[in-house]
Regions:
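Short S/T/G/P-rich N-terminal loop/turn motif that feeds into the first structured element of a domain
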Residues: 1-41, 45-50, 58-60, 83, ...
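Conserved short beta-strand edge segments in small beta-sheet-based binding/regulatory domains
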Residues: 73-85
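Short, well-ordered coil/turn elements that cap or connect secondary structure elements
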Residues: 35-36, 72-74
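Small, basic N-terminal interaction modules of short regulatory proteins
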Residues: 54
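Short amphipathic alpha-helices in soluble, non-transmembrane regions
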Residues: 24-27, 62-72
Length: 127
């Protein structure tokens, strides 16, 4: 992929039989590797082990590492450049745009209406 400043979605499924803990650790190692670009977002899957990562790819070196699976060697990996998320800020803007345009709600409104669920780790971080 030629570098054209934009975010990419990396979709990664661990090999059959890999324990969830190991899959989570390997995905986190991939996310933590700053050589791959700016890690904008990631999450892990329930059920099939693996996860997804959004990277803001800003250089030829970062782009080249999209072909290097690193700790995800042996995984089913697919990389998809995103249309409107041209940077980390663009990814955040696209999130807000989608909520507001397709559901008529702002992220701040959703945050204000959330209950005190102990699973909501992001509420502990902002307290």
């Amino acid at each position: 992929m030629a570098v054209s400043r934009r975010c990419v979605l990396v979709y990664a499924l661990a090999p059959e039989g890999m324990p969830a803990r190991e899959a989570n650790d390997r995905l986190n190692e991939y996310v933590a590797d700053s050589r791959r670009g700016l890690s904008v977002w990631h999450d892990h899957f329930i059920g099939a082990h693996g996860g997804a990562v959004v990277l803001d790819v800003r250089s030829e070196e970062e782009c080249a590492l999209l072909d290097d699976r690193g700790p995800l060697e042996g995984w089913d990996l697919s990389v998809h450049p995103l249309t409107f998320s041209l940077s980390a800020v663009g990814f955040a803007a696209q999130t807000s745009f989608t909520l507001e345009s397709y559901r008529g709600v702002r992220l701040e409104e959703l945050a204000a209406a959330e209950t005190d669920d102990p699973r909501f780790w992001w509420r502990r971080r902002s307290a």
